[in-house]
């Protein structure tokens, strides 16, 4: 049993080194609050640089099983829906098996060739503010994730 758990943890850590392509379903272990931000921003920038983006959905999920201090399995889904060249949405969802969840929803609107806004809760943000707002949202959610993952990381170091 101990050997099985050790191998599972090694697999979780090694998944960080896999190459990533836009549009794939990622099973990542996020170690810091910035990790989710880096992945999602890379894909948002890809979309913003496309002249005529096609419909895409990007999902980011913490590799499972990830056990937190309360023994819960934690999962994060970040979905990017591109409806057409002018509109899209970003959704963040955080779940564990104790019933805890957190959800944030953003709309991306393209009004002119180089003008984008993100809107949420009746607030709108200009294109130049997109990365800051995304980082804020990712930080709030991934901080909760990293608190759980630190436990797994520490366990991995002790049995390595």
Residue ranges of model-derived segments:
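Mixed-charge, Lys/Arg-enriched low-complexity segments
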Residues: 4-31, 35, 112-160
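Intrinsically disordered, low-complexity regulatory segments enriched in Ser/Thr/Pro
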Residues: 70-139, 143
